Amino acid sequence: MSREKFSLPTPIFYPHRIFSACVGAQFIAPLSRKGAINRAPTPGFQKMGVGKKNSLTLKLVRGGEGFGFCPMVGYNSFMSRSGIITLTSDFGDQDSYVAAIKAVILGIFPEARLVDISHQVPAQDITHAAYLLKSSALYFPAGTVHLAVVDPGVGSSRRAIALESQGHFFVGPDNGIFTDFLGPESRTFLLNRPEFFRPRVSATFHGRDIFAPVAGHLAKGADLESLGEPIFDPKKLPRPEPKVLPDRIVGEVIHVDRFGNLITNIPSELIPSRSTIRIMGKDIPGLSPHYQSAPAGVLLALIGSTGLLEISLPEDSAAQRLKAWTGQAVEVLFTGE
């Protein structure tokens, strides 16, 4: 598309904003009244490459002050989005908290597809929420936004963050809930731009007033960098690794699901074909292929859907039978070839 087609009155500039773009044209530089390329005084235009050819065009609108480019605060079309927002919280389903969060998101992005991972996280159990995210988030399409609110530090000095990792976006408190997505390639930003929040922010409900609107803007196409400043020290939860000794592997229970299965931190590839699994003084001979491989009431060990060693009790709860919970030691004893 030629420059002459953009020979309109001087555009209205919106400082510190990136402008909406759509696929189609090749020139995005604004023009002066004489048709010369203006030097755009905004980070948004600089970021998009003023004066350079691109496969993008900007939407021109006419306002009270003349022609200009229609702005969408912090938005661009370079980052793909799936339109999906997942929700994880400890809010349960008897109160209106989850509904309020969804209402805020839909007010910003009515086309969003909202998927509940779980709202039954035990109250303030950050580790539990982190496990749910780790075991589900990356099954969603790239460009999905994952909103997680298990936030015992709400209203305190704990930071609010958004991050990008492995093609996905995460929004929530900086309390370790996103530990498993923090790596060398991830990018984390402090949420400190109030224009992306609700007008009035409650000290007790950042899920509704900060995280929900940010998630809505991200899913709609907001640029991650526009949400705040980069940080390089997001909080991480401790992640105990199994210890491999000459005669055994020593690990621990990291999650208990609603069936009472004890999920450990021992991956399948570490477990030899001949072994005995020991927990709380009880020995389980070898691995079973599935949950019904032993009679009802008999403990068994197997590799679960996450690829980790589990202790299960057919038709009952292994956690209740053993009175075991997260942190409980589990050993895999090597019994020879």
Q: Where do the model's predicted regions map?
A:
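A conserved acidic, glycine/proline-rich C-terminal tail/linker
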Residues: 263-323
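Active-site histidine-anchored catalytic micro-motif
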Residues: 84, 108-114, 125-131, 140-143, ...
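N-terminal glycine-rich anion-binding loop in soluble enzyme alpha/beta folds
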Residues: 82-120
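Polybasic, lysine-rich low-complexity intrinsically disordered segments
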Residues: 5, 18, 34, 47-48, ...
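Anionic-ligand-binding alpha/beta catalytic cores of soluble enzymes and soluble regulatory domains
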Residues: 198-265, 270
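Short, low-complexity intrinsically disordered segments enriched in A/P/G/S/L with frequent Arg
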Residues: 6-8, 14, 29-31, 39-44, ...
